[in-house]
């Protein structure tokens, strides 16, 4: 058999593009996305000759190694080694009524946000659509789930999705496809630091997914201190694109705001944020800073987080606080940095997983 990297990635294909004739394509799609098959030999209702032909030409996995690090709160950080040796991460977050995965779209990230460990890594490369999808499929396999049991996807891991839009759109289309993962568009959230051109493009694609803007400051001066690349895209320009997205899709937009001590946590900044969002169907998601080794910033104390939230609510802005999950294994928001937690805690994968 050819080495994995020499084979073609079958996860790049929409169900109607899969190899085979007619109903054989539907069978393959069912094995991939409903049953979560990780080897063509598992597809027992396909003729043996077809299974062998598929295995000679296509690969099912984009990873050479998968490591899992469980948190005390039930979430699990996954560290994936890609076929070229580069690495990326994703997080599984089980809740009482839903199962969520946080997926990466890049190796590293070019945005360089000061509060984010991923940004400190710099940019490695874009992930392919297959590499984005396989994070979800591998997590489902490891958790003993059908891929279709994971009903919430947030593209909030490593990377800026709108700077890898071609691959992200392809992956999202497969997620939404009725013969693939069959996700509801409202269950898919794409997070961006604010790339106006990408937001307009996303609106025109009209996939109906949710948009989350990593704003982190209500004014350009403060935002440039937090996000080095913010000088390229003034807040006014970003907000114009966001308002267009809302008008086009009728989807409420989430604004993510990581609170940093003495930087963006003053109550006057809460009032300025409320003014900025006036007239827009918006929800503010306040994120307490999750510490990481070498971080140049500090988080706002809990009392300050609560006060900022109360001020926004007083001004009529729907607001919630995203308290951390997975912080003990470096899986919380802003902590993904390709680091193995200490002490090392490996969750064994089923035999053959990640191959």
UniProtKB/Swiss-Prot annotation:
Its EC number is 2.1.1.192. Specifically methylates position 2 of adenine 2503 in 23S rRNA and position 2 of adenine 37 in tRNAs. The active site is at residues 89, 333. It is found in: Cytoplasm. It is an enzyme of class 2 (transferase). CDD domains: Radical_SAM (cd01335). One of its GO terms (biological process) is rRNA base methylation. Keywords: 4Fe-4S, Cytoplasm, Disulfide bond, Iron, Iron-sulfur, Metal-binding, Methyltransferase, rRNA processing, S-adenosyl-L-methionine, Transferase, tRNA processing. This is Probable dual-specificity RNA methyltransferase RlmN. It comes from the Bacteria. The keyword Methyltransferase applies. It catalyses: adenosine(2503) in 23S rRNA + 2 reduced [2Fe-2S]-[ferredoxin] + 2 S-adenosyl-L-methionine = 2-methyladenosine(2503) in 23S rRNA + 5'-deoxyadenosine + L-methionine + 2 oxidized [2Fe-2S]-[ferredoxin] + S-adenosyl-L-homocysteine; adenosine(37) in tRNA + 2 reduced [2Fe-2S]-[ferredoxin] + 2 S-adenosyl-L-methionine = 2-methyladenosine(37) in tRNA + 5'-deoxyadenosine + L-methionine + 2 oxidized [2Fe-2S]-[ferredoxin] + S-adenosyl-L-homocysteine. Belongs to the radical SAM superfamily. RlmN family. Reaction proceeds by a ping-pong mechanism involving intermediate methylation of a conserved cysteine residue. The keyword Ribonucleoprotein does not apply. GO terms for molecular function: 4 iron, 4 sulfur cluster binding; metal ion binding; rRNA (adenine(2503)-C2-)-methyltransferase activity; rRNA binding; tRNA (adenine(37)-C2)-methyltransferase activity; tRNA binding. Residues 95-322 form the Radical SAM core domain. Its cofactor is [4Fe-4S] cluster. InterPro entries: Aldolase_TIM, Elp3/MiaA/NifB-like_rSAM, Methyltransferase_A, RlmN_N, RNA_MTrfase_RlmN, rRNA_lsu_MTrfase_RlmN/Cfr, rSAM. PANTHER family: 23S RRNA METHYLTRANSFERASE, RADICAL SAM CORE DOMAIN-CONTAINING PROTEIN. [4Fe-4S] cluster binds at residues 109, 113, 116. It comes from Thermus thermophilus (strain ATCC BAA-163 / DSM 7039 / HB27). HAMAP family: RNA_methyltr_RlmN. Binds 1 [4Fe-4S] cluster. The cluster is coordinated with 3 cysteines and an exchangeable S-adenosyl-L-methionine. S-adenosyl-L-methionine binds at residues 159-160, 191, 214-216, 290. Disulfide bonds join 102-333.
